[in-house]
From Swiss-Prot:
Biological source species: Mus musculus
Span list, region Disordered: 36-57
Name of the protein in its database record: UDP-GlcNAc:betaGal beta-1,3-N-acetylglucosaminyltransferase 8
Role, per record: Beta-1,3-N-acetylglucosaminyltransferase that plays a role in the elongation of specific branch structures of multiantennary N-glycans. Has strong activity towards tetraantennary N-glycans and 2,6 triantennary glycans.
Assembly: Interacts with B3GNT2; this interaction greatly increases B3GNT2 catalytic activity, independently of B3GNT8 enzymatic activity.
């Protein structure tokens, strides 16, 4: 009798054990099958800390047979750009590029002085309002670095009165070249008055043309390293953009710390190719550059981590000059081993018919281009309590 009871107990235990194993196995199998449908996507791996290898060729995509294009040849050979006698690089380029004389005038002018990256501030002490350094007690969370041109008075004033107006944690600066220009009106007295009135103009003594926008980036990075090294983020933006500052600040404050430390955020172009049609604004001759562009954020506006300023300067000293500022920035980030991050709230090819649509802008971070008049109109209507979207 006892043996029979023992057998029954043992049988029951074995049955329960088998049932437990079956349930666990079927549950695990179901979860594995269900994962692709219902599981959260894997988080994007954070950018690593910046590094700068001795040989940048592999980082910059030059792993195959070396192209005969001048930029590619220079990048393979380049150690560091000359810090003295910077005109030599351009003189050599003019002599070694066989069809240099056929290049567009703007590109020839750029190449002749492309290695020259040290320019004095245009307004000496006493002749204008020098831009104050960031104090220890007033370090901006977000620096608004707006690329402008001396004659763009209306655009600068529209920015000051709208998205560039004082907000806790932000500071506004405009980046300009010399107001002397080439054959244009003499704007020195007007720009000097503006600098004294607002104290937000960083002016350098170089020719302010589109191909020199890279200079504004590099000189800003130098200024940051000396005068505002602890800024958290820098928005580098054109003066014809519209920025939703509250939304941008909110987004930046929610970033994981690892992302924030190496941020390069905007509307990202990947696998872009040079335009080969002569006469276009972004024409690049095959004898100058071969290959695809790096992933880069559109120059209409993007955000970088402030702590990367000295790193980007080191990278720029070892990346051969390139005429387009946003593409060149992409090369420098690629040299550091850092990838850009795309955000759908950055739209830098904004259609003209939507520039007076506050509901469309309300959910975005940055749109470009927008005229000064539309910038003011948008700003006034974006914050109307009665706005129904």
């Amino acid at each position: 009798m006892r043996c029979r009871k023992c057998q029954l107990c043992l049988s029951a235990l074995l049955t329960l054990l088998g049932l437990k194993v079956y349930i666990e196995w079927t549950s695990e199998s179901w979860l594995k099958k269900a994962e692709p449908r219902g599981a959260l996507p894997s988080p994007t791996p954070p950018n690593a800390e910046p590094t700068l290898p001795t040989n940048l060729s592999a980082r910059l995509g030059q792993t195959g047979p070396l192209s005969s294009a001048y930029w590619n040849q220079q990048q393979r050979q380049l150690g560091v750009l000359p810090s003295t006698d910077c005109q030599t690089w351009g003189t050599v380029a003019a002599s070694e590029i066989l069809d240099f004389i056929l290049y567009p005038q703007e590109l020839r002018r750029f190449l002749l002085s492309a290695a020259c990256r040290s320019f004095p501030l245009w307004l000496p002490a006493g002749e204008g309002s020098p831009v104050a350094s960031c104090s220890d007690k007033d370090v901006p969370y977000l620096l608004l670095a707006v690329k402008s041109e001396p004659g763009h008075f209306a655009a600068r004033q529209a920015v000051r009165e709208t998205w560039g107006s004082p907000v806790a944690g932000t500071r506004l600066l405009f980046l300009l070249g010399s107001p002397l220009g080439m054959g244009g009106p003499d704007l020195r007295s007007l720009v000097t008055w503006e600098s004294r009135r607002y104290g937000d103009l960083l002016l350098w003594d170089f020719l302010d043309v589109p191909y020199n926008r890279t200079l504004k980036d590099l000189l800003l990075l130098t200024w940051l390293s000396h005068h505002c090294p602890d800024v958290n983020f820098v928005l580098q933006v054109q003066d014809d953009a519209f920025v939703h500052i509250p939304a941008l600040l909110e987004h930046l404050q929610t970033l994981p710390p690892t992302w924030a430390r190496s941020l390069y955020l905007g509307e990202i172009f990947t696998q872009a190719k040079p335009l080969r049609k002569p006469g276009g604004p972004f024409y690049v001759p095959k004898t100058f550059f071969e290959g695809d562009y790096p992933a880069y954020a559109s120059g209409g506006g993007y955000v970088i981590s402030g702590r990367l300023a000295p790193w980007l300067l080191q990278a720029a000293a070892r990346v051969a000059p390139f005429p387009f500022d946003d593409v060149y920035t992409g090369f420098c980030f690629r040299a550091l081993g850092l990838a850009p991050r795309a955000h759908p709230g950055f739209l830098t090819a904004w259609p003209a018919e939507r520039t007076r649509d506050p509901c469309a802008v309300r959910g975005l971070l940055l749109v470009h281009p927008v005229s000064p008049q539309d910038t003011i109109w948008l700003w006034r209507h974006l914050w109307v309590p009665e706005l129904q979207c």
